[in-house]
Design a protein with these regions (language model features):
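Short, non-helical or kinked segments that cap or interrupt transmembrane helices
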Residues: 52-64, 130-143, 170-178
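Alpha-helical transmembrane segments in multi-pass membrane proteins
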Residues: 29, 33, 38, 42, ...
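Helix-coil boundary and interhelical linker segments in multi-pass alpha-helical membrane proteins
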Residues: 17-29, 92-116, 147-154, 187-199
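C-terminal ends of transmembrane helices
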Residues: 42-45, 123-134, 161-168, 213-215
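Interfacial segments of multi-pass membrane proteins
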Residues: 68-72, 94-98, 120, 138-168, ...
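Cytosolic, membrane-interface loops and tails of multi-pass inner-membrane proteins
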Residues: 44-74, 135, 217-237
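Loop-to-transmembrane alpha-helix initiation sites
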Residues: 155, 171-178, 193-204
């Protein structure tokens, strides 16, 4: 009895240690991804270009679209590359890092760990601690995570985005519809095998719509800026 009781206690202790290790690894990697996500591409480019802050210009959003409107193509390209890169690092590198002391817990689902890190980077982009929690709308960083999670889906999303953009001229609308098309595609083509990825895409599709709520209001009021040069069907004078 004493031997059995001792073995039971040992197993319980090991389980507790394993649970703590799991939570520590998840927590640290979530925070690392969030901190990386909090690095705003527009702020980095602004410092490199003499202290430009696009949050005080145009729509006030520190994302690629406002960067393009206010600073031009090269500046906007730099912003997008940095913001997409954050998602690539969070989803592609952070989950595989072996942490000092903590190590790597093989009991953790690598899929859920990767999704955890990917989500943290998008949250960091929208609510960056380095910039008083005033960030972008999350689309570029979400794309970066999807390049790692499901690269084949990116071409489909890009086609949807371009299609809506040339029909409407609204970048925000194109981004929202492309985001919503991701879980639809996965529901039709990949369920039930890719359920975690479907949940991730469905949650962040709604999240992207939420972060674009000001665009929705402006479109309803007729005040949203439209890129008429990219529209295929546009009125000609």
């Amino acid at each position: 009895m004493l031997v059995q009781y001792g073995c039971y206690n040992a197993r319980q202790s090991l389980c507790k240690i394993g649970t703590v290790t799991l939570m520590v690894e998840l927590g640290i990697k979530f925070l690392l991804s969030y901190f990386i996500g909090s690095i705003m591409g527009s702020m980095v480019m602004g410092k490199l270009c003499g202290g430009v802050d696009i949050r005080t210009m145009g729509s006030g959003n520190p994302g690629g679209t406002n960067a393009l409107r206010t600073q031009g193509g090269l500046f906007a390209l730099g912003v997008v590359v940095i913001d997409v890169g954050k998602g690539l690092i969070a989803a592609g590198i952070i989950p595989g890092i072996e942490l000092p002391i903590v190590g790597t817990d093989l009991e953790i689902s690598r899929t859920w760990l990767t999704l955890n890190c990917a989500a943290a980077s998008v949250i960091g982009h929208v609510w960056p601690m380095w910039h008083k929690f005033h960030g972008g709308k999350g689309a570029s960083t979400l794309v970066g995570t999807l390049i790692i999670l499901t690269p084949g889906l990116i071409a489909c999303l890009l086609l949807v985005w371009l299609w809506v953009l040339v029909l409407s001229g609204y970048v925000g609308l194109a981004t929202m519809i492309a985001s919503l098309s991701a879980p639809v595609y996965l529901a039709v083509m990949r369920l039930p095998s890719d359920q975690p990825l479907f949940i991730y895409c469905a949650m962040f599709a709604l999240y992207i719509v939420f972060t674009h709520r000001s665009n929705i209001r402006r479109m309803m009021d007729g005040a949203e800026l439209r890129n008429s040069r990219l529209m295929f069907f546009r009125r000609r004078n």
